[in-house]
Amino acid sequence: MAKILVIGGGAMGSAFTVPCIDNNNKVTITEPYSKNFIRDLTSKKKFHSSLKLNLSKKLKFKKFSGDLLKEKFDLIVIALSLSGIDFIGKALKTSKVKTPLLVLTKGLKHEKKTNKIFTISEQLKKNYNLMNISVLKGPCLAKELARKNQTSVIIANRNIKIAKWIGKSISTKYYLIDFSTDVIGVEVCS
């Protein structure tokens, strides 16, 4: 059983909690800026307005803060939109987080100064000196995952043992996972 923090209460972050909880992990979710998702996640029934379903009663919600990031977690999942990557990168760097990170966010970032394109994992390493970053990508829709429809993803980390540990912690009969050491390739192809 792992202690997992999911940062981002949108559709994918919230849907991702379903297989995590089904795999007997202790899951906490936080939402840095959307009042709608905070309302959804703190309601008694935990009805998620985007997913159109009630999330597990086992799911804990905690207010986002630097202190929350300093708590002991086995895995921190980043499920923010691309525009939230700089925000969370700064927060994780400030909190001196050493916990393994799993990035669900899709997209590439164009750096105007150098006219280069970076993947999210490259950006987090380069700009915020964050290490031990895994990425999870695949043809997985949030609503399908939340409804436990069978879907598949790939977890990539240069250290395949970490990718496999994460996979073992979150895989279910409906959430099938493959692994790769090609982090950039998996990110670019998502």
What annotation goes with each model-predicted range?
Residues M1-L55, L59-K63, K70, E111, ...:
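NAD(P)+-binding Rossmann beta1-loop-alpha1 motif at the extreme N-terminus of oxidoreductases
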Residues I4, N25-V27, T99, M131-I133, ...:
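Hydrophobic anchor at the start of a short beta-strand
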Residues G13, S83-D86, L108, K161-I162, ...:
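Glycine-rich nucleotide phosphate-binding loop and flanking beta-alpha elements
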Residues T28, K60-K62, S134-L136, D178-S180:
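General small-molecule cofactor/ligand-binding pocket signal
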Residues Y33-S34, L108, K137-L141, N159, ...:
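Glycine-rich beta-alpha junction loops
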Residues L55, K62-K148, I166-G167:
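Rossmann-like NAD(P)(H) cofactor-binding subdomain of soluble oxidoreductases
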Residues S95, K126-I133, Q150-S190:
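Internal alpha-helical scaffold of NAD(P)-dependent oxidoreductase catalytic cores
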